[in-house]
Amino acid sequence: MKMKNNIFFAALSACLILASCSSDTEEPVVVPATLDCNGIEEGTSMQDDCGDCQQAYIYDFVSHNVQLLDDTMELTLGQTEILVMPNDPTNPYWNAGCIPVPSTYTFDRMGQSTVSYGGQTARLQMAVELYGSFSSASEAELLEMYNDGTGFSDPALNSSGKKLGNKTASYHYSSLVKPMFDAMLSKQANVVMPAVNAGTIAAPGVAGEYTGAGGRSVKVDEKGFELNQTFIKGMIGALCVDQIVNGYLSPSKLDPADNDPSGLGAGEYTTMEHYWDEGVGYLYGLEADITAPTFSGNGSVLLNKYAGKVNTAGDVDMNAVYDALKAGRTAIVNMDYTERDAQGLIARELISKILGVKASDYLRGGASELGNTTPDMAEVIHDLSEGFGFVLSLQFAIDGSGNYLFTKEEVDAMLANLEAGNGLWDIDAATLNSMADDIDARFGL
């Protein structure tokens, strides 16, 4: 018992934060040397609970599993397991201290920022230029920008090594979804723009340009789809949400073995820290200052733009998303993976909700216009082309339990309804409202 007491007394000299870190800034309570900071006699408990749980545990250095302990008596270790006492520096998760959740998304090591998502900023910039090239670029030029990451006006983008195509639906249904985006680019260049340039007036079954009574002009394929809208709204889900929700913030991506800060210098980051930041970058990568995101004036055509819209409308609280992202990144620094996953799930669910809100909004917008005595078909087409892209995106959204809200088959069925017959030229309001009702029910809107 004396040896056990000595082990525990030595363990009080520092804190290993496994489950969470204390942010208590009050002066430490002076206690007798034989008691821990909760007044428990040394050696009588495996917990040294100085504010939050700091326990001895078993660590498996192959599977990286952790088993908290209340007692080490009669303990048998497996061949790949080690016993780690509180604050033992041999612990692969060793962390000499903890940090509180910052007021802004600001993290550093030795005074230099560790937040980095330059690759995400580059891809978002690529999306802006690609979207702006739909009416002027050839098929080869559009596909080069999308798949090769070259052909942009900014030499820095061309030499970045980043691409949009290889990140499209890369975590979910890539082989089935990615070709849809290639096809949109090809059809825009080979079908829509030749008809527009020839002065063809779009009509059911005829690609070209159509101007509505309100003055809006739309460049559409034979089914009435604005392919620039179906493409870019689809990329909100297939690129941004898939990368965030199903990739960088997903527990399956965040292996504790990738979060060893030992030996890191000023401004250097662990792989897990960087993964989290990369996920954040798909939302905030075009913001001038991530410490004060505005969701406006940054040229975004993807997730950030619509995050601002739903935040302004009160449909999704983006402050809650920001807080969860800060708390999750803090938990990574503190090696509190339970908290990391809890905060990650909050952010992932709320970001997913953006897709449901906008898909429903655009479908109902089209249905509302169709309900007029003389619908403005340019407005219908524009709303429903955007709606098509958001519906396509729904297969990447999750609920509060981390489960997908729609299967690919369900999404494909909705897309088929929009494409049936002459597509948007003869869709009816009842079909649109029924689809929107289903989306609302799934997301709890």
Regions found by a protein language model. Name each.
Residues 20, 36, 49-55, 272, ...:
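Generic hydrophobic/packing signal
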Residues 1-19:
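Sec-dependent bacterial lipoprotein signal peptides
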Residues 61-445:
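Mature extracytoplasmic or organellar-lumen-exposed domains after removal of signal/transit peptides
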Residues 6, 21-74:
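Primarily marks secretory-pathway-exposed extracellular/lumenal segments that are disulfide-
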